[in-house]
């Protein structure tokens, strides 16, 4: 059975901040944000926008844009780390707003930024094992990344939701049922206690945890593959990653390349040029949406996927890798195959018009919202 993504859509806040403006306000060289982090803008959620409203709007877009009947949804899962209640899931509010059927299996998943990918895997397995009986799964990644004013994490904020419909009619992308690697380890790289409205993060440590998890998940995936050589980097036309900030994808791809090559490669290495070229061809091209929106936690990998699908054709995109990471930590590496002809859905996928219609906030307006 072919199972994967039938439809996908993004919805974000109506306002944003220019990172160059934020840098000047904080007395920082703008290059630190725009080149060091690779970020251009960050979406800012107002008090009228929360995880629920972002999720509902993304869900409405994916159903409307792809002409999917809400009564065909048999499972609804929201992956988030910025829920609105310690007990009641965001998903049940979305269920009500969309008017989904009463026997729709509905719940929320949480594992930092890995929550939505966990939901995608669950939906994929639900359909693959025959329990769906023709129904589809609606998976939504919805989050608001927020840090205190002046905090080192401030320029890595963002907000938004990505909604996906998983079904046995994967018009956009099919998941490889054989290759799915996992990695889990208890680490304190990022957390948000119940008493705090903002997160705590050890940035440098978290980068190391991310890269260790990438290696663990990739090695596990290859160990499970009957023919691991089929998943070598040279056979991948695109490699997309969890993107807390755009430059993290460069670090991730570098490590991915090293594991594939079975050698460490630094800036003095003869193969360093190959690493940079590989990143440019397989990853960097699909980071413009992340750079314009910021960190949306559970949805950041899928925002990069939207960028990939809107800017590619099935002639030059046959096999891709997808790495998901959630602090704390959990990670997965999976392989997927874009469906031939997926480009006919480009207009339904592309959020460019919405992003261009956003209103720029002054720093004082932004600080008042915070």
Regions of interest found by a model, annotated:
Residues 204-258, 289-290, 294:
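A conserved active-site cap/scaffold subdomain adjacent to cofactor or substrate pockets
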Residues 241, 259-262, 274-282, 307-317:
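Hard-cation-handling environments
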Residues 32-36, 40-52, 81-136, 142, ...:
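Conserved catalytic cysteine-centered active-site region
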Residues 306-356:
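Catalytic phosphate/nucleotide-handling subdomain of diverse soluble enzymes
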Residues 1-48, 151-219, 335-370:
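Condensing-enzyme catalytic core mediating Claisen C-C bond formation in acyl metabolism
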Residues 29, 51-66, 90, 209-226, ...:
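Short, well-ordered amphipathic alpha-helical segments that serve as non-catalytic structural scaffolds
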């Amino acid at each position: 059975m072919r199972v994967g993504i039938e439809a996908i859509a993004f919805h974000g806040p109506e306002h944003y901040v220019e990172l160059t403006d934020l840098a000047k306000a904080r007395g920082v060289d703008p290059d630190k944000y725009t080149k060091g982090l690779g970020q251009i803008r960050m979406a800012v959620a107002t008090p009228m926008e929360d995880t629920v409203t972002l999720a509902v709007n993304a869900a409405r877009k994916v159903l409307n844009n792809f002409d999917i009947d809400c009564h065909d949804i048999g499972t609804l899962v929201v992956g988030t780390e910025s829920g609105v209640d310690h007990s009641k899931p965001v998903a049940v509010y979305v269920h009500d707003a969309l008017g989904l059927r009463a026997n729709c299996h509905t719940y929320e998943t949480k594992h930092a930024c890995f929550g939505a990918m966990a939901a995608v895997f669950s939906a994929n397995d639900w359909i693959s094992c025959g329990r769906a009986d023709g129904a589809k799964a609606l998976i939504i990644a919805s989050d608001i990344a927020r840090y205190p004013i002046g905090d080192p994490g401030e320029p890595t904020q963002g907000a938004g939701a990505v909604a996906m419909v998983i079904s046995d009619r994967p018009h956009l992308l099919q998941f490889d049922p054989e290759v799915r690697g996992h990695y889990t380890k208890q680490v304190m790289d990022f957390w948000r206690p119940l008493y705090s409205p903002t997160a705590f993060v050890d940035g440098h440590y978290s980068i190391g945890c991310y890269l260790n998890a990438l290696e663990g998940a990739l090695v596990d995936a290859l160990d499970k593959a009957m023919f691991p050589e089929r998943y070598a980097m040279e056979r991948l036309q695109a490699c997309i990653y969890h993107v807390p900030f755009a430059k993290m994808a460069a670090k991730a791809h570098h490590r991915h390349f090293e594991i594939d090559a079975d050698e460490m490669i630094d800036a003095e290495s003869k193969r360093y040029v190959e690493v940079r070229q590989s990143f440019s061809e397989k990853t960097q091209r699909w980071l413009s949406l992340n750079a314009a929106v910021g960190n949306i936690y559970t949805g950041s990998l899928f925002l990069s996927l939207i960028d990939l699908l809107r800017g590619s054709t099935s002639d030059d995109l046959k096999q891709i890798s997808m790495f998901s990471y959630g602090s704390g930590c959990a990670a997965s590496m999976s392989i997927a195959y874009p469906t031939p002809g997926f480009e006919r859905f480009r207009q339904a996928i592309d959020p460019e018009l919405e992003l261009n219609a956003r209103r720029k906030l002054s720093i004082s307006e932004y600080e008042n919202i915070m």
